[in-house]
Amino acid sequence: MALRNLMTKKPFAGILTFRQQLRCVQTFSLPDLSYDYGALEPAISGEIMQLHHQKHHQTYITNYNNALQQLHDAINKGDSPTVAKLQGAIKFNGGGHINHSVFWKNLAPTREGGGEPPKGSLGSAIDTNFGSLEAVIQKMNAEGAALQGSGWVWLGLDKELKRLVIETTANQDPLVIKGPNLVPLLGIDVWEHAYYLQYKNVKPDYLKNIWKVINWKYAAEVYEKECP
């Protein structure tokens, strides 16, 4: 996530308040993809990838940055109602940015290892916690297909219990909403914008085919870092 600082006026000297922690506002920018938009075809079309990345993800970032700036201004003004009102926009758009930033890394072209089963410690953990990789895929597909409305289905690591979990989140809620110790290893976007242009209303087909381009290598790297 690229960051740049927008410097603002310092609050009155000698007053140690939360305002002093907000003398600069961090803003976020659209992350580059490590592959071309068409590189995931036929599992995910280039048209969907371009629209999803350039339009949908960018919109979350733009709205997130705007909400953060408004929050900064409201805190400096002591405008508590506006501070409270902005929490929903920050959660939704910030979550959209967080989730999509993980999602792009969870994908890889087949020629670059997309779809290859996980090995090493993550592969062993999957067998221990779920019995097999196929069981994980079936459970995540079932959870994703059953999710009402928009949301995400996740394979996560519970760092405290040192075990893998499968969870769903609504709208753009990030996985951490389900627990502060949960780390996302793999997230699948089940919003219609992720598949409708190609799969229409047949979400199960999208969920079936996306595994052909899942980047298990990235998931394994996160797992090994968080659960050495």
UniProtKB/Swiss-Prot annotation:
<comment type="subunit">
    <text>Homotetramer.</text>
</comment>
<dbReference type="Pfam" id="PF02777">
    <property type="entry name" value="Sod_Fe_C"/>
</dbReference>
<comment type="similarity">
    <text>Belongs to the iron/manganese superoxide dismutase family.</text>
</comment>
<feature type="transit peptide" description="Mitochondrion">
    <location>
        <begin position="1"/>
        <end position="24"/>
    </location>
</feature>
<dbReference type="InterPro" id="IPR019832">
    <property type="entry name" value="Mn/Fe_SOD_C"/>
</dbReference>
<dbReference type="InterPro" id="IPR001189">
    <property type="entry name" value="Mn/Fe_SOD"/>
</dbReference>
<dbReference type="GO" id="GO:0004784">
    <property type="term" value="F:superoxide dismutase activity"/>
</dbReference>
<dbReference type="GO" id="GO:0005759">
    <property type="term" value="C:mitochondrial matrix"/>
</dbReference>
<keyword id="KW-0560">Oxidoreductase</keyword>
<keyword id="KW-0809">Transit peptide</keyword>
<dbReference type="InterPro" id="IPR019831">
    <property type="entry name" value="Mn/Fe_SOD_N"/>
</dbReference>
<feature type="binding site">
    <location>
        <position position="100"/>
    </location>
    <ligand>
        <name>Mn(2+)</name>
    </ligand>
</feature>
<feature type="binding site">
    <location>
        <position position="189"/>
    </location>
    <ligand>
        <name>Mn(2+)</name>
    </ligand>
</feature>
<dbReference type="Pfam" id="PF00081">
    <property type="entry name" value="Sod_Fe_N"/>
</dbReference>
<feature type="binding site">
    <location>
        <position position="52"/>
    </location>
    <ligand>
        <name>Mn(2+)</name>
    </ligand>
</feature>
<dbReference type="InterPro" id="IPR019833">
    <property type="entry name" value="Mn/Fe_SOD_BS"/>
</dbReference>
<dbReference type="InterPro" id="IPR050265">
    <property type="entry name" value="Fe/Mn_Superoxide_Dismutase"/>
</dbReference>
<dbReference type="InterPro" id="IPR036314">
    <property type="entry name" value="SOD_C_sf"/>
</dbReference>
<dbReference type="GO" id="GO:0046872">
    <property type="term" value="F:metal ion binding"/>
</dbReference>
<dbReference type="InterPro" id="IPR036324">
    <property type="entry name" value="Mn/Fe_SOD_N_sf"/>
</dbReference>
<comment type="function">
    <text>Destroys superoxide anion radicals which are normally produced within the cells and which are toxic to biological systems.</text>
</comment>
<keyword id="KW-0496">Mitochondrion</keyword>
<protein>
    <recommendedName>
        <fullName>Superoxide dismutase [Mn], mitochondrial</fullName>
        <ecNumber>1.15.1.1</ecNumber>
    </recommendedName>
</protein>
<keyword id="KW-0464">Manganese</keyword>
<keyword id="KW-0479">Metal-binding</keyword>
<feature type="binding site">
    <location>
        <position position="193"/>
    </location>
    <ligand>
        <name>Mn(2+)</name>
    </ligand>
</feature>
